[in-house]
Each structure stands twice: as structure tokens, then as C-alpha cells.
């Protein structure tokens, strides 16, 4: 029984793709789902910050995880949505599939799960031409090389 449960959980985690080169096309990693253990999740977030992995990969949070307003629907009280911007898909993958994240950081929020999250990655769209002068560019001013991040062994 234990083997079946473990196999089902492992099957939901995508196998790491071959490392890529950063193409300077920013992506947004969306973490969404109910949080069950807020203090443990905050400790996990602090460990990510202290690890320096986001700094090395040019990643940063775009929002606080709790809404300030709800315009439609009734989200559960414990719903968390967090958006993390990376300079490219290669660096988002370097983070997710790194030995540091998979072997050290991610286990801090598992067994039992501090929350039930879906983690997806989307391409960032450019600012509309008519608005570009008013809001400026979201471009990165230096390169972040995710290829130096040690990959988890799977």
C-alpha cells in the first residue's frame, strides 16, 4: 500500500528536462492551493531566502500570497497564490530541479504537507506598446546563469 501511495505522489512530479540555456524570456511560476500549516510554510520560505538560490537565479516574488480583495467567487480562507518571476524557463527549471530545492528545501513543506499546491509556469507577456512608456521595462539588467545549479539525482 505504501509503495502505491509513494508511486502516485512521485508520478505527479515531472521528470527533469535536459538543462537549457537562458533565452532571456521571463516566466512566472505560479504556486496555488490551500495552505494547511502557515508557520511551517513561512519557515520554508525563510529557508529559500537564506539559501540564496533565488538571488543566484534572478527570481523574486511578485505578490504577497494572500489576496487584498476578492472581486468574484468565494476562495477558501487558506488559499495561497504566489507568483515568482524568473528571467527564463531555464532558470525556473534550474531552481525546481536543483539538488538544493529537491533534497533540502522542498522536503521542509512535505510529510505531512504544509499545503496542497499546483505549481505551473507561464510565459510573461510584453507590456502593451501604448503603455510601455508609462510603466517602463521589466527587463533584467544582468544575466543570471542557472546552468551552474547542481541538479537533483532522480
Each predicted region: which residue ranges?
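A common structural junction motif
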Residues: 52, 100-106
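Short cationic/low-complexity microdomains
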Residues: 94-100
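Conserved short beta-strand edge segments in small beta-sheet-based binding/regulatory domains
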Residues: 60, 105-122
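Short S/T/G/P-rich N-terminal loop/turn motif that feeds into the first structured element of a domain
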Residues: 5-80, 86-94, 121-154
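Short, flexible helix/strand-to-coil boundary loops that buttress conserved ligand/catalytic motifs
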Residues: 45, 96, 105-109
Amino acid at each position: 500500500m505504501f509503495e502505491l501511495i509513494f508511486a502516485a505522489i512521485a508520478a505527479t512530479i515531472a521528470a527533469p528536462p535536459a538543462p537549457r540555456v537562458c533565452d532571456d524570456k521571463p516566466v512566472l511560476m505560479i504556486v496555488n492551493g490551500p495552505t494547511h500549516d502557515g508557520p511551517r510554510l513561512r519557515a520554508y520560505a525563510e529557508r529559500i531566502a537564506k539559501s540564496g538560490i533565488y538571488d543566484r537565479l534572478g527570481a523574486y516574488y511578485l505578490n504577497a500570497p494572500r489576496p487584498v480583495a476578492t472581486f468574484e467567487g468565494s476562495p477558501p480562507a487558506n488559499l495561497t497564490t504566489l507568483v515568482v518571476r524568473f528571467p527564463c524557463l531555464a532558470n525556473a527549471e534550474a531552481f525546481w530541479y536543483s539538488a538544493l530545492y529537491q533534497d533540502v528545501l522542498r522536503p521542509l513543506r512535505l510529510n505531512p504537507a504544509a499545503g496542497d499546491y499546483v505549481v505551473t509556469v507561464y510565459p510573461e507577456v510584453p507590456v502593451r506598446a501604448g503603455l510601455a512608456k508609462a510603466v517602463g521595462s521589466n527587463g533584467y539588467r544582468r544575466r543570471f546563469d542557472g546552468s551552474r545549479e547542481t541538479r537533483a539525482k532522480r
